[in-house]
Swiss-Prot record:
It comes from Renibacterium salmoninarum (strain ATCC 33209 / DSM 20767 / JCM 11484 / NBRC 15589 / NCIMB 2235). The lineage of its organism: Bacteria, Bacillati, Actinomycetota, Actinomycetes, Micrococcales. The gene is adk. This is Adenylate kinase. Residues 31-60 are annotated as: NMP. AMP binds at residues 32, 37, 58-60, 86-89, 93, 134, 145. Coiled coil: none annotated. Pathway: Purine metabolism; AMP biosynthesis via salvage pathway; AMP from ADP: step 1/1.
Length: 193
């Protein structure tokens, strides 16, 4: 069983790579962003609350996010492993995830960090906004999201690095090239254990 996280700044390719890697490893990819967007589209109470934060480029509060992740990780399809994208983003969420996993006698195996230059990420996200019409992808909001990543989520990365779980991977390049780099990085972390 493989339990993994994929982290990285907005636009670094986490969602795309999560799908490719989960297919290769035969595990389920879980995206908190997809779950939030589905709730927003369905106008659920969670979705309406989340939308306010998402439109401003802010993180959805831990109280909402933690409950959603806990519920998702208790579903049947994660029993063979998972690749979680978009969570945890804060130290408090790391603690919550540790609690969720340890309650089931589990722990993380690998944390993948996709890296990319901020200016490249802004270009990618502005292009995505034009293609998809996402309201949370204008340049001001994009730069705010990048700043949030650097100030909050990078502390999460440091924590996992200290635990020997982190594999840093350059997220720039063709999808299959990045996927190959990720698979090699996963093998490297597993071999070091």
């Amino acid at each position: 069983m493989t339990r993994m996280l994929i982290v990285g700044p907005p636009g670094s390719g986490k969602g795309t790579q999560a799908e490719w890697i989960s297919d290769r490893l035969g595990i389920v990819a879980i995206s908190t962003g997809d779950i939030f967007r589905a709730n927003v589209k369905g106008e659920t109470p969670l979705g309406l609350e989340a939308k306010k934060y998402m439109d401003a480029g802010d993180y959805v509060p831990d109280s909402v996010t933690n409950k959603m992740v806990r519920d998702r990780l208790q579903q049947e399809d994660v029993q063979h492993g998972f690749l979680l994208d978009g969570y945890p983003r804060t130290s408090a969420q790391v603690n919550e995830l540790d609690d969720i996993l340890s309650a089931g006698g589990e722990k993380l195996d690998v944390v993948l960090q996709l890296t990319a230059d901020d200016e490249e990420l802004v270009r990618r996200l502005l292009g995505r906004a034009k293609e998809s019409g996402r309201s949370d992808d204008d340049e001001k909001v994009i730069r705010h999201r990048l700043n949030l990543y650097h100030t909050q989520t990078e502390a999460v990365v440091v924590r996992y690095q200290k635990l020997g779980l982190l594999a840093k991977v350059d997220g720039i390049g063709a999808i299959d090239e990045v996927t190959d780099r990720i698979m090699a990085a996963i093998d490297g972390v597993r071999a070091a254990k």
